[in-house]
UniProtKB/Swiss-Prot annotation:
Changing F79S: Confers thiophene resistance. This is Polyketide synthase Pks13. 4'-phosphopantetheine is transferred from CoA to specific serines of apo-Pks13 by PptT. The gene is pks13. Its EC number is 2.3.1.-. The modification O-(pantetheine 4'-phosphoryl)serine is found at S55, S1266. One of its GO terms (molecular function) is fatty acid synthase activity. The lineage of its organism: Bacteria, Bacillati, Actinomycetota, Actinomycetes, Mycobacteriales. The active site is at C287, H423, H463, S801, S1533. It comes from Mycobacterium tuberculosis (strain ATCC 25618 / H37Rv). It holds the Pfam family Ketoacyl-synt_C. Residues 548-567, 1344-1368 are annotated as: Disordered. PANTHER family: FATTY ACID SYNTHASE, SI:DKEY-61P9.11.
Length: 1733
């Protein structure tokens, strides 16, 4: 893009005396000839670029014009004067005179809405080339004049460079640029993104997430504090290059790529992750995107759409496409890769990637929130140049216009601007045009000695395109922060096309002070999009008015009293509010004028002054400083604590004050896993942080792994908390507490005439019954208000006796005045009454260790005693005559119980209070109870819960009852616990109620309640409150920990603590691009003369979906082809090219895939495809459940198994595990019947021996599930070469039905094909009717398969099958394991009747039938099963329990099962597998079938003990079997944890561990608490699980007896209780449940140790519902399965599906394929090692 230059700026034509019309005619002729049009057809008013004139034409035209006229022009004239009309005038008449002197009268003041407020920049983040990854790094680079431009990094664009022609183009292109070092890295765990999704997310989205976090952290705004707030997100982005990778092969493109590569999601993903509720917009205006985004953010703040804005831009150079395009255009990219803005040698720009983000607030809001304001945006504007001189050509008129608009918006004269951060692309066209526009607006009218300074950050970081404006803003903000303008580099001298002096511009080439022409530093920032969208932002330094609160405007003089006819008005403020926040109306003011309250008494002032003097004379001790550390995950919290401790030991950390460190930490994000270290100095802080990092307890350290889910209950205690000096220290040292003490003091003076403050300040005060109550009330109010000042609030309150008054206030039930009145009346009456007591009228109170039931029995011996307080489940406060109180105390002590007498003369809450009730009623007349605003657990109303918003309760009767009747404190606490509350905070000068709270919570089964005191006798009161609030914060309750620190006076008050560390891992899609098509599935295609088709495919990696390959190949030739059946013969080796051959036949084709390595070919896949758009429906047998056909578009019944992709069902292990070696497809000439082949297929799929299959029983009753049905369906289609079969035809039928179906299809292929074609237009109902007609009369009844029973088999009635779902308890549950399957089948075969379900009661058999069943079972189980065993078994499950012992015995030596023995002589490395929870290693048979046929496998069965104890037993046996190695250790579920533990044990002994495979051994996403409360919850879940699984009702579990038992004891206790209750669960299942429970607990409690080696985690998508039901914390999965923090080299292989599916087909095929490659590499390495020896 060229620019304009002129040797004679305003000189008219000299060589030819032409007129303007003549010049126009000449130009028309020239242009017409150049573009091939008749001159007369040329429109002089149309831009010449639209007529077809190119830049190259313009150069030639300029030379001809110079020859003709003598006027030297450059190409830029064509852009400044785009039409023939304009250009001719310019050539003949020259440029019009420009008045650079300016017009002093021009008004630049703001006009328009008052909302045009200034906007504060409070946070900044940068990610620029050259390792400018923080604002500090960026500033240092700018100040030093460094750049981040490099050659194309190794590996960049490697996906594209495999294509030779593309590689050649890249090699010859100008590819120097600004590249980020780690564009592929992303911390997916931190941002809670699964690996697969992270791989599919555009790096621009990842950058936006990280930059937002860093910007908020830089702003010291906790991201957590903005959740749900009106936070706007505006992000510029103009490319989505990553989509090229995501869809490079559309056949495997992941759905995550839809959102992952969408530009709109860049901003949306930020809003989603951070839970921002303001506008969320991605802006694309090309190179001005990020500055336009900032402008829109400013507007959103001004118009109220947002209260905080995150704005900026991102850019990533993922593909070479744009770079190649610009390079081939020419004159765009700089040959040396450096941008030379406004320089004489400017020759183009350099592409760069990166991003920057700003955090914006309204200035007033930033000042209110105590934010550090970095700079201020005074104004901004955007525009477009409209239909100018070409879509992508810059336009100086439009640029000048946007400048004017921006400075008008700011209300600033542009002549006072100090510095312009220019767009400055370094092109010979763009720079002169930009300079011209600046000269017209910013330079106009300036004195020559006050030029506008000019620079461009592009010279340092390159052109970040959509993020360019963010980079420019970052530079200006940093320059303002450091009060220095950094140099613009690569400047060789002024461009010859720019008159700097005339335009009053000056380039900065050295660090320069801000000139402050207008009295303060002022800058403008420009960005221009190549599509014509222009933006300019005006930025200034922070002024005193920005950070100093404005003086309040004086209140107007009160108006005179209104005339009667006038409406009443309020003097002063427009509105007034009462203490509840309600508007006070004029009438209310008139009716109830506020009485003037007394102030602080002179005596109190004297005492206060003396106390302050005493305090000042004391030795100053360091304050207790809270250091908050948190993270989403506990492991990250620990790592952050460790890093902070290390930093605090560094010189920088030691030089930073503890308060500055705590203040900085308080403004970090507050994650769910929190800790607070309370410290007086650095040493204490470091010790505490080390304890957090190690997960250990320590003094003044509070740490929890997750938040409490319910809010705190504020406990307002009663009598007993009083002591001398209570509240005094806090009053003297905390202004908030002091202010509220004085408020209550004024009200008490008004009520009683004496000062509470005097009592608090009097060190000799001995509190009486009256003064105790009033003073505790005052302290409670002040404590609560202090907590509320720091953001704390109760979820509910509970008062105890005198505490009811403060409770009523905090619940919103009474105003402070009325609450004070209540406590004053109560206490005064009690004080007066006690003073009059003597002799026989004296009553005492005592606490005794008796429960409510016990105290009633004891009271039979003490008739005059009464209950005052039900304090705890085993503690009661009683009152009565002294002799009876002394007697009950003696009795309790004699019984070994706790007993304590109170120092009182009266007994409140007893009949002794009766004389006071009348006076109390009179005293409290006029109080106004209101509806509570938070929950109340009322100890007056027997602990009942009062909901917020309910009817008012605090009337006079409430206070009478509260004084006279018993206090139900423990009832209220128990109700709170039962309502889910676990945190109890006592507001008192000394904790007196927490002990009773603890006793009650423990009795309720809550053994880890959070019991938090406020003040305590003989403890520093300020430190106590800091500790209280730290605990509230740690438990996740409302508490703004920032408020625990004084307001910062400047940056020096914040420590430069370590930032959040992202743990980035590579997330990248393995796309490949190739011109020969071989990397695009199915590969390069060749049609052969014999009608066959061949494809050659070069897969991008070893993980090839062979079914997808076949489908892709078939679709080339048969667009409607559907994969009918397939068989995988082998696993392709690494580096193999796949050759697919297709041979057509009527109705479809056969397809084979061979793996080719060099000239060697191996058949790996054999498949059959059919010509079908949807499945053909084969007829089912009459007498079977009708198979409902599902045509295209027809709805599928809910119970129909989902037919996902063929890819999952075609990777079938039938041929590799069960089918005889070398078996081919069925043929009628083979001599094998359809029934024989069908028996093999179904038996192998369902785990039955073919001879055990009862043919008359519906398959679903035999235990058929969706996966089995799909496997049978596909195998039948493949073996019998049939069109697709309906799944319901398999699922709902018995074997006779399926056999008849196959026979019919084999004999009537043409008819079936026609039926399929016809059904494409039919509904499901029509298909069903046609099917019935087709089969009418053609199929006979089913026949018995076995005559052993000696009776005829019954025929199904009315063609109906039994309901397979069996809703009744214990009814129609199908077989679940091998033992139950063989037992079920044997019973059905011998008796000729289906048992129905394993729990169904069996009919009585005769001895002959029982003997036949016993004989058959003995043969199958290879163990003695007797007829007595059969006759005494009530159901199949019970009989199967006896069979199971022998059936599973197998080849077991001790705890080692031989699954496949290795040959005696050598052989391959064996695979050692470990049992899953509650199961045996037989489950690994599907995996064995997926590994090479000569791979030995040994299973390690269950032993008792913890994970570590089991490994200690396994490791010696492993060494005995395998010596020094190499070892391959594999396990599913618990087996994975055992494999891992054995790997550690072997490595410690120096053994060679080559492979550790964890098959979905995924740890819980949250730490599982090991508490007594968790025991109760765990067994509740177990009961629900058992009832669901075994269809039984579990009796009530005696939790209280479980708490003292270990896991083994608990499970035995519970299972014994279940058995004794009459629930019939056989012993085998009981033992299975015992081992399952203990095994799962072993996983939960395992102490995972670090492993320095490679571990492969085969990870499913989720746990199955039963696992989550038993332990809900397994519902959450970390992206690394919870192993990342322990394993140095973790490989995660996603396998999909649920946990329970991971060990079976089809998912195990994926595991086997990957593991086979690993085993092959191990064998290759062994061979290599042997060769070297």
């Amino acid at each position: 893009m060229a620019d304009v230059a002129e040797s004679q700026e305003n000189a008219p034509a000299e060589r030819a005396e032409l007129t303007v019309p003549e010049m126009r005619q000449w130009l028309r002729n020239w242009v017409g000839k150049a573009v091939g049009k008749a001159p007369d057809s040329i429109d002089e008013s149309v831009p010449m670029v639209e007529l077809g004139l190119s830049s190259r034409d313009a150069v030639a035209m300029a030379a001809d014009i110079e020859d003709l006229t003598g006027v030297t022009l450059s190409v830029a004239v064509a852009f400044a004067h785009p039409t023939i009309e304009s250009l001719a005038t310019r050539i003949i008449e020259g440029e019009p005179e420009t008045d650079l002197a300016g017009d002093d009268a021009e008004d630049w003041s703001r006009t328009g809405p008052a909302e045009r407020v200034d906007i504060a920049i409070v946070g900044l983040s940068t990610r620029f080339p050259g390792e400018m990854n923080t604002p500090e790094q960026t500033w240092q680079a700018l100040l030093e004049g460094r750049d981040g431009i490099t050659d194309l990094p190794d590996g960049r664009w490697s996906e594209f460079l495999e294509e030779p022609r593309l590689a050649a183009r890249v090699a010859g292109a100008r590819t120097r640029g600004g590249y980020l070092k780690d564009i592929k890295g992303f911390d997916s765990e931190f941002f809670a993104v699964a690996k697969t999704e992270a791989d599919n997310i555009d790096p621009q989205q990842r950058m936006a997430l990280e930059l937002t976090w860093e910007a908020l952290e830089h702003a010291r705004i906790p991201a957590s504090s903005l959740r749900g707030q009106a936070v706007g997100v505006y992000i510029g982005s103009s490319t989505n290059d990553y989509s090229f990778l995501a869809v490079s092969d559309p056949t495997v493109a992941h759905p995550y790529a839809i959102t992952g590569t969408s530009s709109s999601i860049i901003a949306n993903r930020v809003s989603y992750f951070y839970d921002f509720h303001g506008p969320s917009v991605t802006i694309d205006t090309a190179c001005s995107s990020s500055l336009v985004a900032i402008h829109q953010g400013v507007q959103a703040l001004r118009n109220g759409e947002a209260d905080v804005v995150v704005a900026g831009g991102v850019n990533a150079l993922i593909t070479p496409m744009v770079t190649l395009g610009f390079d081939e255009i020419g004159a765009v990219l700089a040959p040396d890769g450096r941008i030379k803005s406004f320089s004489a040698d400017a020759d183009g720009y350099t592409r760069s990637e990166g991003g920057g983000m700003l955090v914006l607030k309204r200035v007033d809001d930033a000042r209110r929130d105590g934010d550090a304001i970095l700079a201020v945006i005074a104004g901004s504007a955007v525009n477009h140049d409209g239909r100018s001189n070409g879509l992508i050509a810059p336009n100086q008129d439009a640029q000048a216009d946007v400048l004017r608009r921006a400075y008008k918006d700011a209300g600033i004269d542009p002549r006072t601007v100090d510095y312009i951060e220019a767009h400055g692309t370094g092109t010979i066209l763009g720079d002169p045009i930009e300079a011209e526009a600046l000269g017209r607006v910013v330079g106009r009218g300036r004195p020559a000695d006050r030029p506008a300074l000019l620079g461009a950050v592009k010279t340092n970081v390159g052109h970040l395109e959509s993020a360019a404006g963010a980079a420019s803003m970052a530079k200006v903000v940093l320059a303002l922060q450091h009060d220095k303008l950094p140099p613009s580099i690569n400047f060789a001298g002024p461009s010859p096309y720019i008159d700097f002096d005339a335009m009053r511009l000056k380039m900065i080439t050295t660090p320069t002070d801000w000139p402050r022409y207008g009295g303060y530093a002022l800058a403008g920032v420009s960005s221009f999009g190549f599509g014509g969208a222009n933006a300019h932002v005006v930025v200034r330094e922070v002024l005193p008015r920005d950070v100093v609160e404005k003086e309040p405007e004086p209140e107007p003089e009160p108006k005179a009293a209104a005339e009667p006819a006038e409406a009443p008005t309020l003097a002063g403020h427009a509105l007034r509010f009462d203490e509840f926040g309600n508007i006070i109306t004029d009438s209310a003011v008139a009716e109830e004028p506020e009485p003037e309250l007394p102030g602080v008494t002179e005596e109190a002032l004297r005492l206060k002054e003396a106390a302050l003097e005493e305090l000042a004379a004391q030795e100053v001790t360091a304050p207790l400083v809270p250091l908050a550390v948190s993270a989403f995950l506990t492991s990250r919290k620990k790592a952050a604590a460790a890093e902070l401790a290390d930093w605090m030991q560094s010189p920088e950390g030691q030089a930073s004050s503890l308060e500055s460190i705590g203040r900085s930490l308080s403004r970090r994000n507050h994650g769910r896993s929190r800790a607070v270290v309370l410290a007086h100095d650095h040493d204490e802080a470091i010790k505490g942080l080390r304890a957090v990092a190690a997960g250990k307890q320590a003094p003044n350290v509070f740490s929890v792994d997750g938040p409490v889910t319910t809010g705190p209950v504020w406990v307002l205690a009663g009598f007993g908390a009083q002591h001398r000096k209570m509240g005094k220290s806090l009053y003297l040292r905390n202004e908030v507490f002091a202010a509220w003490i004085e408020k209550v003091d004024a009200l008490v003076q008004d009520e009683l005439g004496y000062s509470v403050l005097e009592l608090i300040l009097d060190d000799a005060q001995d509190y009486g019954i009256e003064t105790t109550q009033v003073t505790i009330f005052a302290i409670q109010i002040a404590l609560g208000e202090l907590l509320r000042h720091h953001g704390a609030k109760p979820a509910a309150v509970i008062g105890q006796s005198l505490g009811e008054a403060a409770s009523a206030y905090f619940a919103g039930g009474l105003s402070l005045r009325d609450a004070t009145r209540a406590i004053c009346s109560r206490s005064h009456l009690m004080g007066e009454g006690e003073a009059m007591l003597f002799g026989e009228y004296i009553r005492l109170m005592a606490l005794v260790e008796y429960s409510a039931d016990e105290i009633r029995e004891v009271f039979s011996d003490f008739p005059d005693l009464e209950v005052c307080v039900y304090a705890a489940p085993t503690q009661t406060v009683i009152g009565g005559p002294p002799e009876q109180v002394d007697a009950i105390l003696a009795r309790a002590e004699a019984e070994g119980k706790f007993a304590r007498k109170f120092a009182t003369k009266g007994a409140s809450h007893t009949s002794q209070m009766d004389p006071l009730l009348g006076e109390l009623t009179a005293e409290l007349q006029g109080i106004k109870p209101t509806s509570p605003t938070c929950g109340i657990f009322s100890t007056v109303h027997e602990g009942r819960y009062i909901k917020p918003g309910g009817e008012p309760i605090h009337d006079v009767e409430y206070w009478k009852k509260g004084l006279r009747h018993s206090v139900y404190f423990t009832h209220g606490i128990r109700n709170a616990v039962d309502s889910g509350h676990t945190t109890f905070l006592e507001l008192a000068p000394n904790p007196v109620a927490l002990m009773q709270v603890a006793l009650t919570t423990a009795d309720a089964g809550l053994h880890d309640a959070q019991l938090i005191p406020t003040l305590a006798r003989k403890q520093d009161e300020v430190s106590s409150m800091v500790s209280t609030m730290a605990q509230l914060y740690v438990y996740g309750h409302d508490l703004d920990i920032r408020t625990l620190f004084s307001r910062a006076s400047g940056p020096q008050d914040y420590a430069n603590i370590p930032p959040t560390r992202f743990k980035r891992k590579e997330h990248w899609l393995p796309a490949h691009f190739s011109g020969d098509g071989s990397t695009y599935m199915p590969g390069t295609h060749v049609a052969l003369p014999d009608g066959r088709h061949v494809w050659e495919y070069a897969p991008r990696d070893g993980n090839v979906d062979l079914a997808a390959l076949v489908r892709a190949a078939a679709a080339h030739v048969l667009p409607d082809a559907q994969l009918t059946a397939a068989e995988q013969r082998a696993v392709p080796g690494d580096g193999a090219r796949l050759v697919t051959t297709m041979t057509r036949h009527p109705g479809g084709a056969s397809v084979q895939v061979h793996a080719r390595i060099d000239e060697s070919f191996t058949l790996v896949y054999d498949a059959l495809v059919s010509r079908a758009g949807s499945e053909s429906v084969l007829p089912t047998a009459v007498g079977a459940a009708t198979a409902i056909a599902v045509a295209d578009g027809a709805p599928v019944a809910p119970e129909t198994p989902a037919e996902d992709a063929d890819a999952e069902t075609l990777s079938d292990s039938l041929t590799t595990r069960y089918m005889p070696s070398g078996m081919t497809r069925w043929s009628p000439d083979s001599g094998e019947t359809i029934a024989e082949r069908l028996g093999l297929i179904v038996g192998s799929a369902m785990g039955y021996e073919p001879e055990d299959l009862p043919w008359e029983v519906p398959l679903i009753e035999l235990g058929l599930d969706s996966l089995m049905a799909v496997r049978i369906k596909n195998r039948v289609e493949y073996d019998f070469d049939l069109p697709p079969i309906q799944l319901t035809a398999v699922r709902d039928a018995n074997l006779y039905n399926v056999e008849k179906l196959i026979e019919y299809a084999v004999e009537h292929r043409d008819e079936v094909q026609q039926l399929h074609e016809h059904q494409k237009t039919q509904t499901a109902e029509e298909i069903a009717r046609a099917q019935a007609e087709l089969l009418h009369g053609k199929v006979g009844k089913t026949e018995p398969v076995d005559s052993e029973a000696g009776v005829a088999l019954p025929s199904p009635q009315n063609g109906e099958q039994p309901n397979p779902t069996g809703p009744a308890l214990n009814v129609d549950v199908p077989p679940r394991d091998a033992a139950e399957r063989v037992t079920f089948a044997t019973w059905a075969i011998v008796t000729g009747k289906s048992p129905g379900g394993i729990f169904n009661e069996l009919p009585r058999l005769d001895d002959e039938a029982a003997a036949k069943i016993a004989q058959r079972l003995s043969e199958r189980a290879e163990g003695p099963i007797t007829a007595e065993d059969v006759l005494t078994s009530s159901n199949i499950e019970a009989l199967a329990d006896k069979v199971r012992t022998y059936l599973e015995a197998g080849q077991i030596d001790g705890f080692v099962r031989t699954l496949r023995a290795r040959p005696e002589a050598g052989g391959k490395v064996p695979v050692f597998v470990f049992h899953p929870a509650g199961g045996s290693t037989v489950v690994y048979e599907p995996l064995l079938g997926r590994l090479p046929a000569d791979t030995p496998m040994y299973g390690f069965e269950r032993v008792e003990g913890s994970i570590e104890e089991r490994a200690q037993q396994y490791v010696p046996k492993l060494i005995e079997m395998q010596g020094d190695g190499p070892y391959v250790l594999v396990g599913w579920s618990l087996g994975g944890v055992l494999a891992y533990a054995c790997a550690i044990g072997l490595r410690r002994l120096g053994k060679d561990v080559r492979f550790v495979g964890l098959i979905d051994a995924v740890r819980a996403g949250e730490e599982i608490p090991q508490t007594k409360e968790e025991i109760r919850k765990r067994w509740d879940r177990y009961a629900a699980f058992a009832e669901k699984t075994f269809n039984v009702t579990i009796p009530a579990i005696p939790y209280e007896q479980l708490e003292e038992l270990d896991d083994e004891g608990q499970v035995r206790f519970v299972l014994d209780a279940v058995s004794q209750s009459g629930v019939q669960i056989p012993a085998g299942i009981i033992e299975h449940q015992r081992t399952s429970y203990l095994d799962n607990r072993a996983i939960d409690t395992a102490q995972i140790q670090p492993y320095d080696g490679h571990v492969t985690l085969y990870m499913a998508d989720r746990y199955h519902d039963d696992a989550i039901m038993f332990e809900p914390r397994y519902a959450v999965r970390q992206p690394d399965g919870g192993w990342g923090e322990y394993v140095s080299d973790l490989e995660v292989v996603p396998i999909g599906g649920e946990h329970i599916q991971a060990i079976d087909e089809p998912i195990i095929a994926k595991v086997g394929e990957h593991m086979s490659r690993a085993l092959g590499q191990i064998e290759a390495d062994r061979t290599s090692e042997v060769g070297k020896q």
